[in-house]
Structures are given as structure tokens and as C-alpha cells.
């Protein structure tokens, strides 16, 4: 699939003929300064949400298979439920967001991230876990909208560098969660899951209070 993606990119993505004329040295410091206050608020909330995502993510399969007797085949079904749910909601939600404001859709996505660890903790059967994985799929609900909002909030003359710097900073900081996740799990699944939910709630509240809403041009 990776090879197919490379071939498609080579044939169908056209290079800007003026790209060479626009090239200039890009400094990380300048890119960081391109993060506007509104974009910084989105970044802070997004980092907290990624903590909520990363803390339990390595232990979801352990929780389902080892702790609750789910078979590997059943877990494969659960994973498929999550993936299909995400696929089904992304495009309709993105269309709705283009016709209105983006903040409600991003905020709803953050709520799903915060709720998933709690729902997962109380899901002890295959049927209950099916519901939990529907919720996991709904975490993709507003992802295209959030990415569009990043570009909307980035400076007009530095959108690409601001976008890349946003993800660099987010992923570096969010990777810290991986170091503490195992320690939290060893304290107990509930400690791990509810700590993740607390970070998710903090990110959701922060964005609800400080996140900027934008009306679509259409």
C-alpha cells in the first residue's frame, strides 16, 4: 500500500512551478513564533486530548483480551467497528462544519476522547465493548474539521510551517504520556483509564472556554 501511495503521489500531485522561487530558509524558532494565540489555545487543548488518547491506547487490547476474556477474533471485530464508525462520520461531519462553525464539531470530538476511557472501564462484555469501540470510532468525528481549523488559525503567509510546527510540538509533548502510561496501568486499569479521562476533560474544558470559533466562508 505504501508503494501504491508513492506512485499515486508521483503521478497525480502536481508541483508548483514557482516553488523554487519561494524557497527560503525556515527556522524552527520562526515557525514557533508563527503559532498565533488562537492556534496556541487549540494546541494546548489538543495536547491534553492526546494525553487522554495515548495513556490507555497500549492497554486497550490487554483490557479486552486478558482482563475480560475477549478472543483475538472478537477484538479484530471490535477494531473493525471502530474503523468503520470513523470512516462513516468523517465526511458528513466535515460537510456540516463547512456550512457552519467549526468549534462545536471539534469540541464534540474532544468529548468523545474524554469519554472513551470511562466507557471502556465499565465495558466488561463483548456487546458492551462494541459500544465502547463505536465511541472510539467517533473520535474521528471532527478530525478533518480540527485540521481545517488549524489552517484557518495559522498566519496567511506561513500556513504550512505553522501546521508542521503545531504537530511537532503536539507530538513531542504528548509522547510524555507513553512514559507514564505503564506506571499508571501497574497501579490499576482504573487509575490508567480515569487519569486519561481527566486529561480529556481538561482539554475539552480548556477548548470550550478559550477555543476560537470561526464561521465558514460559505
Model-derived segments and their meaning:
Residues 58-75:
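Short amphipathic helix-loop junctions that connect adjacent transmembrane helices
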Residues 15-48:
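Juxtamembrane intracellular "pre-TM" segments in multi-pass secondary transporters
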Residues 1, 62, 66, 175-192:
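Transmembrane alpha-helix termini and helix-breaking/packing motifs in multi-pass membrane transporters
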Amino acid at each position: 500500500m505504501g508503494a501504491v501511495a508513492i506512485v499515486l503521489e508521483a503521478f497525480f500531485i502536481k508541483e508548483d512551478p514557482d516553488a523554487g522561487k519561494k524557497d527560503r530558509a525556515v527556522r524552527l524558532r520562526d515557525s514557533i513564533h508563527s503559532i498565533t494565540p488562537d492556534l496556541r489555545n487549540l494546541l494546548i487543548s489538543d495536547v491534553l486530548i492526546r494525553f487522554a488518547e495515548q495513556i490507555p491506547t497500549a492497554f486497550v487490547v490487554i483490557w479486552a483480551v486478558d482482563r475480560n476474556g475477549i478472543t483475538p477474533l472478537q477484538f479484530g471485530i471490535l477494531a473493525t467497528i471502530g474503523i468503520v464508525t470513523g470512516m462513516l462520520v468523517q465526511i458528513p461531519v466535515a460537510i456540516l462544519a463547512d456550512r457552519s462553525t467549526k468549534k462545536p464539531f471539534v469540541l464534540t470530538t474532544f468529548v468523545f476522547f474524554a469519554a472513551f476511557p470511562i466507557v471502556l472501564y465499565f465495558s466488561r462484555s463483548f456487546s458492551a465493548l462494541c459500544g465502547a469501540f463505536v465511541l472510539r470510532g467517533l473520535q474521528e468525528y471532527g478530525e478533518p474539521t480540527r485540521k481545517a481549523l488549524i489552517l484557518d488559525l495559522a498566519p496567511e503567509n506561513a500556513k504550512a510551517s505553522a501546521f508542521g510546527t503545531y504537530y511537532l510540538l503536539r507530538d513531542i509533548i504528548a509522547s510524555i504520556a507513553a512514559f507514564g502510561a505503564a506506571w499508571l496501568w501497574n497501579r490499576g486499569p482504573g487509575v490508567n483509564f480515569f487519569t486519561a479521562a481527566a486529561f480529556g476533560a481538561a482539554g475539552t474544558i480548556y477548548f470550550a472556554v478559550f477555543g476560537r470559533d470561526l464561521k465558514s466562508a460559505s
